[in-house]
Amino acid sequence: MSAFDPGQPQHLGIEEEYLLTDLQSRCMVAEPPPEVLRDCREALGQNFAYEMFQGQIEVASPVFDHSAQAGAYLRQVRSALDQALASHGLGFICAGSHPLADWHEQRATPQAHFRQLFNEFALAARRSVLSGLHVHAQVPAAVDRIAVMNEVLPWTPLLLALSLSSPFWQGHDSGYLSYRQVACDEWPRMGIPEYLHDHQAFDDYLRLLRGIGALGAEDNAWWGIRPALRYPTLELRMTDACPRVADAQTLAGLFAVMVRHACLLPAAGSQYTQAQRWLLKENRVQARRRGAQGRYLMSPDQAPMNLGQWLELAEQVFGDTAQALGEEPLFERARQLLRGGCSAERQLSCHAAQPAESDREARCRAVVDLLLWESRDSEPESTNAPP
């Protein structure tokens, strides 16, 4: 099945979304002045992109050969963005949700594409004040991307569990570690992909939905992993945005390694069954609710695993591919992430550590401060605590 030459790098790209934040109130900015967005565009250059809400922007990276390049680029981007916003009394957070954002107050970006989304999907769209980490990994033209997707799909809740960063919603503890993934289920064609055997079935699926008017001619499904339409890639969309660049780099690298591994298999995706899809859906539920405390199954015949055991299994399966790509440190970095706690756990710990007399908003402001600090960190190895 492989169409890779020996030694060929695994190309990848990243899209990150940032929530603009007032440094005084710690609230998400609803309507940033035009000069703020102008300065953001100048800071990020051609990779700047608008998002659904005026107080949210996106960066779409160039193509990289290695996750280390992606990490260096994101640090550069975040540093430039932080400098551009500072003169306006603003900062940004890169997380699945903003602890103090109120979706009622947010304003849609006045562009035709976004207006269509808000008109068509109403409350589901207006409530989607959420940010994800999207990773593109190249798949050779000769390789069926749905077969690769089916091979990688069972592992996506593991990546989600390492990315969790949206425990707060509307100023309250949601009870989930990724409330973003809960909110995503309000949309059609999100979450777990339909059960498809090959790319022809995917093309038939899109053709059917376009034929009945459910999708536009250039539209795609919004699944947590999907074949991209504009690029020869498989795109991971399930993961929450990561406050720390090191975590985003680790997750992007892991996904790229998984895709390369699948591309090298003679029969990728052939073991993906309807029963595995049922387990996949339950693993996603476990990940978004319990994270490291969840219990996970890759096979009906297997004993449940905790997240650490699942990560060990991933290293057994993908370790040789990671080594061949020069990505050996990924699994140790993932273990460090797991030992230190995902972003959602860090946010909840910060919230709980505030003085007993603190009110709900004061506790959430402290969490925003943590996210502001983690998101602006531009150093590859930072051990300093937030002030």
Swiss-Prot record:
InterPro entries: GCL_type2/YbdK_subfam (IPR050141), GCS2 (IPR006336), Gln_synth/guanido_kin_cat_dom (IPR014746), YbdK (IPR011793)
GO molecular function terms attached to this record: ATP binding; glutamate-cysteine ligase activity
Enzymatic class: ligase
Keywords: ATP-binding, Ligase, Nucleotide-binding
Secretion signal, residue range per the UniProt entry: none
Gene3D superfamilies according to UniProt: 3.30.590.20
Pfam families: GCS2
GO terms, biological process: modified amino acid biosynthetic process
EC number: 6.3.2.2
Catalytic reaction(s) noted: L-cysteine + L-glutamate + ATP = gamma-L-glutamyl-L-cysteine + ADP + phosphate + H(+)
Keyword Transcription: no
Function: ATP-dependent carboxylate-amine ligase which exhibits weak glutamate--cysteine ligase activity.
Family as reported in the entry's similarity comment: Belongs to the glutamate--cysteine ligase type 2 family. YbdK subfamily.
NCBIfam families, sorted: gshA_cyan_rel, PRK13515.1
Descriptive protein name: Putative glutamate--cysteine ligase 2
Source organism (scientific name): Pseudomonas fluorescens (strain ATCC BAA-477 / NRRL B-23932 / Pf-5)
